[in-house]
Amino acid sequence: MRLYEEIIAQWQSLLDGLPVRSLPLSDGWPDTGSRNMILRSDMAYELGGENLPALGATAVTAGGFAQDEILLCGPDLPEIRKDVPYARLTVASVRDGLPDQGSALYQAIKKIDFVRYHVNPEGFMTRISAIQGRESVRVSQDALKKGLTFSQVGGLMVKSYHENPQIQAVRLIYITDSAFPFGALEETIQKSREITRAIDHAMTAAMTDCNVCSLKKVCDEVEGIRQLHFGQEQQ
């Protein structure tokens, strides 16, 4: 079932031509759980601070790749000196495909997405506003002195994703390059949210006239949504 493949391809297209580094997955950096509070007086800078772009998104694909990977477009944490625009993109490759039933599919996708709320690297405080669609990060001065990089942050996230046995591999993409087209990226992220909403809609809503449905456009454009929608209708 093809759902987010076009979104993933668009993310790659936006990165084409820009310098992208592959980082090692580092293990051993502590996770502070719910105690990861960084005051403004303790932070070195904020990724996505001062109304700069601050984006986060997760897309799921069925068996698209088998190796974990951390990619970085822009300066790494020790190289940053002030607030910069920021994006965190996760592409999760699941083994054995995705469920083909609305309820199970939606819950599987949300379970993968919710990992971002439960990873708290010491000195790296993620601030998520679902209403505003923002995901910014406060980075502490002390953590930078201890050597915090995106390798440690990404390593913790990858480890957390793999607590879900359905996950085959994870590609994490961090973007801090001010030259990156964040506006275009935000449009793709909005489209990915519409896809997820359409899955939920197909699961929960009574079948109505497709011509008056607010999600008709995304349903028409995404093959997997059409399959899901008409599969529900036939049950």
Predicted region positions:
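Alpha-helix boundary/N-cap detector
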Residues: 2-9, 141-152, 156, 176-183
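Intrinsically disordered, low-complexity regulatory segments
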Residues: 4-53
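Residue-level detector of alpha-helical secondary structure
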Residues: 8, 12-15, 95, 158, ...
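Long, charged N-terminal interaction/targeting segments
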Residues: 33-171
